[in-house]
Amino acid sequence: MAPLESPATASSSEVESSSEEIFKSSSEESKPKDPVTVPSSKTLKSPSAAVNSKTDSSDDSEKQSFVLTRRKKKEGAAESPAVKSGKKRAGEGSTSRDMHVKRVKKEDDNKKANPQRVWSEEDEISLLQAVIDFKAETGTSPWDHKNAFFDIAKKSISFDVSHVQFFDKIRRLKNKYFVNRKNKSGESNHDKKCLGLAVLIWGSDGMNVESPVKKDESILVKGKANSKEKKVEKPLVIEDEQVILGADSEWFEESFLVPVIANLGLDEYSVKKKWSKVSLETKKKIQEKMKVVDAKKCELLLAEMDVLKDVTSVLAQTN
């Protein structure tokens, strides 16, 4: 039998290394291990940990508010068309109400700026025509019998006119269509009618209305050269204007023509009214003819007187 081999003996270096390993392992085992700490909610937090928790909570609240805002925006964007149309309609309604209020205010301002006209165009024509008709009917001036003229003429006015309004309107119509009249190419038919009636009433060849003195009025005019103020007297007007009849109207109404023509079937009022509408040029021509007739009448009367003298002389000499 082979002799048993003795186990290999370790070298000194190997023995030293193994001994060091054993020593390290034993020392590591002898050290107490750190206990595993389990976090507890009851443990007190340090100040730094509290600050960190606050910042974390604020971040969480910001995130929550951001999420809520996003949700609201989405909900607003997801609103139904009916809700949107309702809101739009409500906005349009408020806008239309505002526009209506502005329009009403504008109309009120226009009404204040432009007051409603009291005298119509027909009233103005009727008023001027009433002056002519009263003279033709009565043979006297309307201003000599103002109350009677007012009682008759106010019936042709479309509204309940007062005594002051009545005669003030006549004065203003005279100033507009006679005193301050101007030839305008754009005059309306109404203006032309009023102008014709005004000339017939206040013209020198018509009824010839004169304007007596009302009160002493004057105006100051600055001279161009020396810039001195000069006092210029204005023509004065009396409120109660008097109508002075033209000679052409007097001779016609006092002549034999009116009763003779009236005997033919027309009444004197119609004759005088129609005569007042005859043109002034025609009136003058007829008046000249009447002067010739009156002269021949004088000659005829003298001839008749001469014949009468001869007859009376002969009769006186006869036994």
From Swiss-Prot:
Record field: compositional bias (Basic and acidic residues): 21-34, 89-112
Keyword flag DNA-binding: yes
InterPro entries in UniProt: GEBP, GeBP-like_C, GeBP-like_DBD
GO CC annotations on file: nucleus
Renumbered residue ranges of the record's region Disordered: 1-119
Domain of life: Eukaryota
Tissue distribution: Expressed strongly in leaves and flowers, weakly in roots, and very weakly in stems.
Matching Pfam families: GeBP-like_C, GeBP-like_DBD
Induction note: Up-regulated upon glucose treatment.
Keyword Transcription annotated: yes
Paired cysteines (S-S): none
Subcellular location as annotated: Nucleus
Biased composition (Polar residues): 38-55
Gene Ontology biological process terms in this record: cellular response to glucose stimulus; negative regulation of gene expression; regulation of DNA-templated transcription
Family: Belongs to the GeBP family.
Biological role stated in the UniProt entry: Transcription repressor that binds DNA in a sequence-specific manner, 5'-GCCT-3', to regulate the expression of PGR. Acts as a modulatory component for the glucose-triggered developmental leaf growth process.
PANTHER family named among the record's database cross-references: BNAANNG10740D PROTEIN-RELATED, DNA-BINDING STOREKEEPER PROTEIN TRANSCRIPTIONAL REGULATOR-LIKE PROTEIN-RELATED
Identification of the protein by name: Transcription factor STKL2
Organism: Arabidopsis thaliana
